[in-house]
């Protein structure tokens, strides 16, 4: 009986010693893995990284577009207001513009509401930036065309002036008026279109630049998650191997 008890105690000591060695090796391996990757030492970090939901393409697009799009819209509105006030000050000058040869700028429409032909590209450009009209508004004083009052309709149109047969003024042929609302709208539209054409390539380029770091960060996150999963699988296999080795030692000691 005493010999049997001694053998049982010896087997128990050997099994306990083998289990302690296995636990010590496992703890050493986990400590080395933790030092190589400090982020994995936080409790629940691996599970949080593995179970973290990946953002969809809509959320990613919103994150990338929100900040530069807001800055772009703010700059567009600021420049539009600047263009509006500049056009207002440009339009607040004289009521008509006289060319160097003494002719009045071609009006946008004659007394019959028909458009006059543009004689040259320069006149077309000036007519765009300085449009004129023959509509007489309140608090406007009509001036004779080239200081000539008694002109026939053909001569008046040849001088690119406005002819009125209704007798609303003391003379029938008068100089056209500056079309301030039309000029302001044209300047405003030109500024808006120019701003969009200038800022759109810059915005697209900045969006492309922002997408590259985001893709790199996403790839780095995927690599970290993959590495953590591999380390977890290695530790699991290592613990299983140590447990099998401990059982084998125990069985060998029993024999």
Curated annotation (Swiss-Prot):
Residues 229-238 have a biased composition (Basic residues). The lineage of its organism: Eukaryota, Metazoa, Chordata, Craniata, Vertebrata. It is found in: Membrane. Testis-specific. Expressed in melanoma, sarcoma, lung, breast, bladder, esophageal and ovarian cancers. Residues 90-183 are extracellular. The chain crosses the membrane at residues 69-89, 184-204. This is FMR1 neighbor protein. Residues 125-184 form the P-type domain. The keyword Transmembrane applies.
């Amino acid at each position: 009986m005493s010999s049997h008890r001694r053998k049982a105690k010896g087997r128990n000591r050997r099994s306990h010693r083998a289990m302690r060695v296995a636990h010590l090796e496992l703890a050493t391996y986990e400590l080395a893995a933790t030092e190589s990757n400090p982020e994995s030492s936080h409790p629940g970090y691996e599970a949080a990284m593995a179970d973290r939901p990946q953002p969809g393409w809509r959320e990613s697009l919103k994150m990338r577009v929100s900040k530069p799009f807001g800055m772009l819209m703010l700059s567009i509105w600021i420049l539009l207001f600047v263009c509006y006030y500049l056009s207002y000050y440009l339009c607040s000058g004289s009521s008509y513009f006289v060319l160097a040869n003494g002719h009045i700028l071609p009006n946008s429409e004659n007394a019959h509401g028909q458009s006059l032909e543009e004689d040259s590209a320069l006149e077309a450009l000036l007519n765009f930036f300085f449009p004129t009209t023959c509509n007489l508004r309140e608090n406007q004083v009509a001036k004779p065309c080239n200081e000539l009052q008694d002109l026939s309709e053909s001569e008046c149109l040849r001088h690119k002036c406005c002819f009125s047969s209704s007798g609303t003024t003391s003379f029938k042929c008068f100089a056209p008026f500056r079309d301030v609302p039309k000029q302001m709208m044209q300047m405003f539209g030109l500024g808006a279109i120019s701003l969009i054409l200038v800022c759109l390539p810059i915005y697209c380029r900045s969006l492309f630049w922002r997408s590259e770091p985001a893709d790199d960060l996403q790839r780095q996150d995927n690599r970290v998650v993959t590495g953590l999963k591999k380390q977890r699988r290695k530790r699991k296999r290592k613990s299983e191997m140590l447990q099998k080795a401990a059982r084998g030692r125990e069985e060998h000691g029993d024999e």
